Amino acid sequence: MTKAREQATADELANRIFFRLYQCANMLHKTGTRALDDYGITTQQWAVLGALSRDDAENGPNDGGPNDGGLSVGDLARVLMVSRQNLTGVLARLEKRGLVEKSVDPGDARSRRVQLSHEGRNLWHEALLPKIFGYYEEALEGFSINERVSTLNDFNRLLENFKVLDLDGSGDATETEGN
């Protein structure tokens, strides 16, 4: 294969990969929202509730300090890799439904912390998680454990490359450890 032909093949494969990724993201939004439609939860709200249900968000460092429970809005935006502006509307809708609570961060009065409310925690653990795990099983039908691990590793590598492209000038890319 000539160098030019090899590059054309690489370009075509890249185009197919990114188009398929775009299609998968759209289908995740469409089918994920449909999976939780009985609860009126969108995929964006699902992501927020999921991030807030993690042990580090639920409990904080448990040192009695100002960061016990919840995440700052900025930290939540970084975990989800969305802008604070996009997150604000989602949080407002979840707060209006009583699924999350916001409070002033005791460590920084200019900052707000957000955490699952009692109702949000119950909805997440008792109703949404079983539906979500069922959805995952359907979406990953036919994937062996090894294929799932390989896919996750490929997505992690791709995400690291995206973070390099998204450096904000300070050299500080968003963290994704544990996801």
Residue ranges and their predicted role:
Residues N26-S83:
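N-terminal helix-turn-helix DNA-binding core of bacterial DNA-binding proteins
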Residues M1-T9, N59-N67, I145-N179:
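C-terminal regulatory/oligomerization modules of transcriptional regulators
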Residues M1-Y39, R97-L99, N146, N179:
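N-terminal leader segment of winged-helix/HTH proteins
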Residues K3-R5, A92-S150:
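Charged, amphipathic alpha-helical coiled-coil/dimerization segments
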Residues C24, L28-T31, L80, L123-G142, ...:
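Alpha-helical linker/hinge and terminal dimerization helices associated
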